[in-house]
C-alpha cells in the first residue's frame, strides 16, 4: 500500500529519528529546523530559545510528544573536529548536555550512515553547549551495540547543603556538575523508595527543591555560562547485584528520567570521587528507576577552576524506534502543541505529610 501527502497543505515539516536509551526517549531532529547563527553552541542554543522555541514545543509536547519527551537537534558544529553540533531539548526547554541523548544520537548517526562507519569501533564527536562530547560506538554488522562517551569535566560544586522544604523539613543535598548542575539528594533521608510507583512523589518534591534552590543558592560554573541547578537526582541503595546504587532524576516540567541519566551519573561519580568514595578507573554501575543500567568510570582527575574534578566515561546502549516526518498544519488549533497540567503544583501540606508518613511506613516495612 502506497501512502503520500500533499506538502502544499502544510506550513512546515520536520524529519526525525526516534530512539530510546535504556528506556529514555531521544527524538533526533535532522531536517526542518532553520539555520541557527552563533559563534558557539551556547549562542546557537540561545538563538533557538529566543527565535524558534515554538518548534521545540511542537516536537516535544502533545500531540507529537508528551511531558517526558526528549530531543536532540543536529546542527553544523562549531569545532572542526566535531561531526555534528547538537542541542538537547525537552518539554520544558533546552539543556547544555545530556548523556543518554549523546548515546542515542551517536548510535543513530552510525545506524543511519550519517557518519563514516568502521567496525568494531566508530568514533563520533558531538559539539554541545557544554563542550565537545567524544563517543566511541561499538559496531557489529552495522548495528550500534554499545556507546561509551567521554563527558565534559565533572566536579562537586557544593557539599552538605541543607534546605527547608515545607512539609518535608530540612533536606540535605550536594550540588555537582556533570554537564548540567544537579542537586544530589539521598532519598533514604526522606524515606521514599526509588520505584516506578513513587515517581509522582519524587517529581513533585524534585520540582519543589529546584525552585527553592534556584531562589536561594547562587550558582556559577567557573567557565561556562551556566547559573542554575537544572536537575534533581534522588539516589539510594539498590538490591540489584550488578548495580552499585540506583537513582531517579527529575527535570524539565517534572519529567522523570527513565534511564540512569548520563550527566547524572557523571555528577554522582564526581561527588563520590571528591569525597574519596570512588577511585579512578573503577567501574560504577548506576541503576535507573526502570531497572536499566549505565556503567560509569572516572578516567582521570582534572582541575575545573578551583574545583577538583574528573573526566567521566559513561557506557550504555540505545535502540531505534522509528523514522518519522512531522507536519505543522496551519489550520490546526493545536499546531504548536500543548501540555496538560503544565505547572505541577506541590500537594497541600496535609497531603505532603500524608505522603511522607505513608512512604516512611512503606520504607520501614520493607527494611
What are the language-model segments listed below?
Residues 1-176, 186-345:
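A glycine-rich beta-to-alpha transition motif near the start of alpha/beta enzyme domains, typified by
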Residues 179:
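Glycine-rich ThDP/TPP pyrophosphate-binding loop and its adjacent helix/strand module
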Residues 182-183:
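Glycine-rich phosphate-binding loop plus the immediately following alpha-helix
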Residues 346-366:
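Basic, helix-initiating cap at the start of DNA-binding domains
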Amino acid at each position: 500500500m502506497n501512502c503520500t501527502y500533499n506538502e502544499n497543505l502544510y506550513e512546515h515539516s520536520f524529519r526525525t529519528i526516534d530512539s530510546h536509551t535504556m528506556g529514555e526517549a531521544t527524538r533526533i531532529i535532522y531536517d526542518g529546523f532553520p539555520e541557527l547563527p552563533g559563534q558557539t553552541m551556547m549562542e546557537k542554543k540561545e538563538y533557538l530559545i529566543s527565535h524558534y522555541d515554538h518548534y521545540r514545543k511542537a516536537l516535544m509536547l502533545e500531540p507529537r510528544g508528551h511531558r517526558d519527551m526528549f530531543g536532540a537537534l543536529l546542527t553544523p558544529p562549531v569545532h572542526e573536529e566535531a561531526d555534528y553540533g547538537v542541542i538537547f531539548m525537552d518539554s520544558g526547554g533546552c539543556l547544555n548536555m545530556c548523556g543518554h541523548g549523546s548515546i542515542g544520537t551517536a548510535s543513530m548517526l552510525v545506524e543511519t550512515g550519517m557518519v563514516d562507519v568502521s567496525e568494531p569501533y566508530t568514533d563520533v564527536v558531538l559539539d554541545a553547549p557544554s563542550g565537545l562530547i567524544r563517543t566511541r560506538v561499538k559496531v557489529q554488522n552495522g548495528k550500534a551495540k554499545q556507546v561509551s562517551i567521554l563527558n565534559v569535566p565533572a566536579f562537586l560544586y557544593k557539599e552538605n547543603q541543607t534546605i527547608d522544604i515545607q512539609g518535608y523539613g530540612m533536606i540535605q543535598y550536594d550540588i555537582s556538575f556533570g554537564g548540567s548542575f544537579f542537586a544530589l539528594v539521598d532519598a533514604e533521608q526522606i524515606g521514599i523508595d526509588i520505584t516506578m510507583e513513587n515517581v509522582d512523589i519524587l517529581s513533585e518534591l524534585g520540582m519543589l527543591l529546584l525552585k527553592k534552590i534556584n531562589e536561594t543558592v547562587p550558582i556559577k560554573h567557573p567557565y561556562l555560562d551556566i547559573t542554575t541547578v537544572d536537575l534533581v537526582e534522588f539516589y539510594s541503595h539498590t538490591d540489584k547485584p550488578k548495580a552499585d546504587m540506583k537513582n531517579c532524576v527529575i527535570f524539565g516540567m517534572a519529567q522523570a528520567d527513565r534511564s540512569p541519566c548520563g550527566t547524572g551519573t557523571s555528577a554522582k561519580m564526581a561527588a563520590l570521587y571528591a569525597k574519596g568514595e570512588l577511585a579512578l578507573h573503577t567501574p560504577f554501575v548506576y541503576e535507573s528507576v526502570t531497572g536499566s543500567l549505565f556503567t560509569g568510570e572516572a578516567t582521570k582527575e582534572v582541575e575545573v577552576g578551583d574545583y577538583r574534578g574528573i573526566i567521566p566515561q559513561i557506557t550504555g546502549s540505545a535502540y531505534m524506534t522509528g523514522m518519522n516526518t512531522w507536519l505543522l498544519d496551519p489550520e490546526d488549533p493545536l499546531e504548536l502543541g500543548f501540555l496538560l497540567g503544565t505547572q505541577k503544583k506541590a500537594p497541600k501540606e496535609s497531603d505532603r505529610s500524608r505522603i511522607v508518613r505513608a512512604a516512611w511506613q512503606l520504607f520501614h516495612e520493607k527494611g
